Amino acid sequence: MSAINTLPPIKSIFNDFKEITKAGLAISVVFSSLAGYLLGIHEFNLETIYVLLMLAIGGYCMVGASNAYNQIIEKDLDTLMNRTKNRPIPSGRMSVNTAFTIATILTITGLTILYMINPKTAMFGAISIFLYTCVYTPLKTVTSLSVFVGAFPGAIPFMLGWVAATNDFGIEAGTLFLIQFFWQFPHFWAIGWFLFEDYKKGGFYMLPTGKRDKGTAMQIVLYTLWLTAASILPSFGYTGRLYLTPVSAIIVVLLGLWMLVYAIKLYKNKTDKSAKTLMLVSVAYISLIQVVYILDKFLR
């Protein structure tokens, strides 16, 4: 048999690359960065479109690298959980050395591209990788406070786009960071709820009380309220160039109430089904909020 015939098919390699970088998650994170960038630019021209493309590629590299490092660190724990045991490393389809090489190349490529945009963007990208890989990931098996720590790198992308557009970290970027920071809690606690048994096999502490109880559900409700409050801050005129018109502010409030309804349903029902529904609603919420912000800017 020839050496060529013993190589894995291209499609299989591509699928493993998508899985080691968590392509779906990476694309959603890149969308947040692009949304922040569109909010930060003054006008569309060839230069802004070029930077937009650089941000998309550099952002994917950074998120993909973080996810690859995460799977390297958790390779033994991933074999214990149903949802992760078929990932490239625990299944044996990819070696740790290959995964590390991919992660390293993505890190170098991503940081280089982001630095070409401006040094601040590269700095925040590097901070994100460090916090996610070296702090959040190890803490997941130690304390439920890992979600709090993970919320910091998780909140960077929306803000990163603004920094890429303006080369500045001010009240606007801080507001975008705050929105995505509060969003992390109901989103990841909902995931921690309906995947509780699987996480338990891996020894992960994801829920604030350690249980699927009213205490956890109440905190989800409270953070959903904080999220809604943070999301309408730009409507009060104290967030610099980041501003929401009254109509958009009403839409944002309605979206917040929509998510709050499902958070309250989880509090009342305390079921995995309610938690999974809330998780899906939270994903829709953050994307819709970003779309509303963008449309408000360009259509006002």
Curated annotation (Swiss-Prot):
Leading EC class: transferase
Superkingdom of the organism of origin:
Bacteria
Gene Ontology BP term (one): heme A biosynthetic process
Catalyses: heme b + (2E,6E)-farnesyl diphosphate + H2O = Fe(II)-heme o + diphosphate
- One of its Pfam families is UbiA
What subcellular locations does the record give? Cell inner membrane
Transmembrane regions = 24-44, 46-66, 99-119, 122-142, 145-165, 176-196, 220-240, 244-264, 275-295
Q: Which family does the entry's similarity section mention?
A: Belongs to the UbiA prenyltransferase family. Protoheme IX farnesyltransferase subfamily.
Further remarks about this protein from its record: Carbon 2 of the heme B porphyrin ring is defined according to the Fischer nomenclature.
Task: Name the chain's protein.
Answer: Protoheme IX farnesyltransferase
- Its gene name is ctaB
